[in-house]
């Protein structure tokens, strides 16, 4: 169990490192751009192909760094971006897609001179298993409140 918590903490640290690196390099954005993202990712009908997700994630990080989005909003919209079936819950596949998306986003970011983050698939599967332990109602999904109130996310 300690190994899984450490793995979870490393995954979260990697995600937050990407967020911090992206936020530090971005310029101030207009509040109306934040409102547009809020509207887009709160909508029921969302187009979620990888290219759009990458662009929107980069914009969210930029807006969070500029103070137009709070860190809680950033977490929430990142959660929503990966809720592909719009059931307000993440299953194991959606969590794995979120981790792979974060990994691919880091690898595509060659202009900042950093070494790409490579997360072995086995570690991502272990991460998903550890997150599913936060499933309070044992329905096989993680809701946003379950994720945010779990012991794992309190380590962020």
From Swiss-Prot:
Binding of Ca(2+) 1 occurs at 83, 85, 87, 89, 94
- Tell me which InterPro entries the record gives: EF-hand-dom_pair, EF_Hand_1_Ca_BS, EF_hand_dom, ER-Golgi_Adhesion_Reg
Describe the pH profile of activity. Optimum pH is 7.0.
- Tissue expr: Saliva (at protein level). Salivary gland (at protein level). Not detected in midgut, ovary, trachea, Malpighian tubule system, synganglion and cuticle.
Task: Tell me if Protease is a UniProt keyword of this record.
Answer: yes
Per the UniProt entry, what is one GO biological process?
A: venom-mediated fibrinogenolysis in another organism
Q: One GO term of the cellular component aspect?
A: cytoplasm
Residues annotated as domain EF-hand: 70-105, 123-156
Phenotype of the disruptant?
RNAi-mediated knockdown results in impaired blood feeding of ticks on a vertebrate host. Impaired development of a blood pool, an accumulation of blood and tissue fluid formed at the tick's feeding site. Massive infiltration of host inflammatory cells at the bite site. Increased expression of host cytokines, such as IL5, TNF/TNF-alpha, PTGS2/COX2 and CCL12/MCP5. No significant effects on tick activity and health during the incubation period. No significant effects on tick attachment to a host.
Inducing stimuli: Up-regulated after blood feeding. The highest expression is observed at 96 hours after feeding and in fully engorged adult ticks.
- Gene3D superfamilies from the entry? EF-hand
Indicate yes or no for the key word Protease.
Answer: yes
Subcellular location(s) of the protein: Secreted; Cytoplasm
Q: Which residues of the sequence carry a binding annotation for Ca(2+) 2?
A: 135, 137, 139, 141, 146
A GO MF annotation of the entry reads:
calcium ion binding
Q: Temperature-related activity notes?
A: Optimum temperature is 37 degrees Celsius. Active from 20 to 45 degrees Celsius.
Any idea of its EC number? 3.4.21.-
Q: What is its main location?
A: secreted
The record's top EC class is hydrolase
Extra info from the record? Immunization of mice against the protein induces protective immune response and results in slower tick feeding and smaller blood meals.
According to the record's subunit comment, the protein's assembly and interactions are: Interacts with host fibrin. Interacts with human RAGE/AGER.
Can you say what this protein is called? Longistatin
């Amino acid at each position: 169990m300690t190994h899984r918590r450490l793995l979870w903490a490393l995954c979260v640290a990697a995600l937050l490192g990407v967020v911090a690196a992206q936020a530090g390099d971005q310029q101030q954005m207009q509040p109306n751009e934040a409102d547009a993202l809020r509207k887009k990712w709160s909508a029921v009908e969302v187009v979620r192909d990888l290219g759009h997700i990458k662009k929107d994630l980069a914009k969210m990080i930029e807006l969070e760094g500029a103070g137009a989005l709070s860190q809680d909003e950033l977490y929430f919209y990142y959660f929503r971006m990966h809720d592909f079936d719009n059931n307000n819950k993440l299953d194991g596949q959606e969590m794995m897609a979120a981790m792979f998306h974060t990994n691919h986003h880091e690898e595509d970011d060659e202009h900042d001179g950093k070494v790409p983050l490579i997360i072995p698939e086995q570690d991502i599967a272990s991460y998903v298993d550890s997150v599913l332990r936060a499933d309070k109602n044992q329905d096989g999904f993680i809701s946003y409140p379950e994720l945010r109130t779990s012991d794992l996310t309190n380590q962020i």
